[in-house]
Swiss-Prot record:
Homology family: Belongs to the MacroD-type family.
PROSITE patterns cross-referenced by the UniProt entry: MACRO
Name of this protein: Macro domain-containing protein LIC_13295
PANTHER family, sorted: GANGLIOSIDE INDUCED DIFFERENTIATION ASSOCIATED PROTEIN 2-RELATED, MACRO DOMAIN-CONTAINING PROTEIN
The organism's taxonomic lineage, starting at the top: Bacteria, Pseudomonadati, Spirochaetota, Spirochaetia, Leptospirales
Length: 175
């Protein structure tokens, strides 16, 4: 199981994987952090597809996910998911964050993708506690991989050493 999960500290926009997960906001129109970086690096095609999705379904709800082209990125697709804003833990944030991971993995499966890279969803400007978010991420992905053999590799792409250390410590308990 654990050989399917890889932990790295890199620029997620540079990865050659089937899908990069974007920690998007509900507008799908780009923003700060990883969301802005993906839109800038991927180019206007990503935004164009996001506009089309909005025309069809409206905004993307928290915990849900949608898929677009990856534009100029080395990945084949971008899976945009909306993580919850941390509000103290009393507004279903844990379940919503878990859903963001599960729904992203389901989209990858439905598109026959084998490799997927996740950023640290909701731990930036959404202020989700990093250790709590990492635990939810690892549990959600591990549970999904136990039930599905199609996805071969899941990358957790940490944007700082603090997240890298947290994930590394937690992944030791899943060996």
């Amino acid at each position: 199981m654990n050989n399917k999960i890889k932990l790295i500290k890199e620029d997620i926009t540079q990865l050659e994987v089937d899908a990069i997960v974007n920690a998007a906001n509900s507008s799908l129109l780009g923003g700060g952090g990883v969301d802005g970086a993906i839109h800038r690096a991927g180019g206007p095609e990503i935004l164009e597809e996001c506009y089309k999705i909005r025309e069809k379904q409206g905004e993307c709800k928290v915990g849900e996910a949608v898929i677009t082209t990856a534009g100029r990125l080395n990945a084949k697709f971008i899976i945009h998911t909306v993580g919850p804003i941390w509000s103290g833990g009393n507004k279903n944030e844990d379940e919503l964050l878990s859903n963001a991971y599960k729904n992203s993995l389901l989209l990858a499966k439905n598109h026959s993708l084998k490799t997927i890279a996740f950023p640290n969803i909701s731990t930036g400007i959404y202020h989700f506690p990093k250790e709590r978010a990492a635990k939810i991420a690892i549990q959600s992905v591990t549970k999904f991989l136990k039930q599905d053999n199609q996805i071969q590799t899941v990358f957790f792409v940490c944007f700082d050493f603090e997240n890298l250390e947290i994930y590394n410590k937690l992944l030791q308990t899943y060996k």
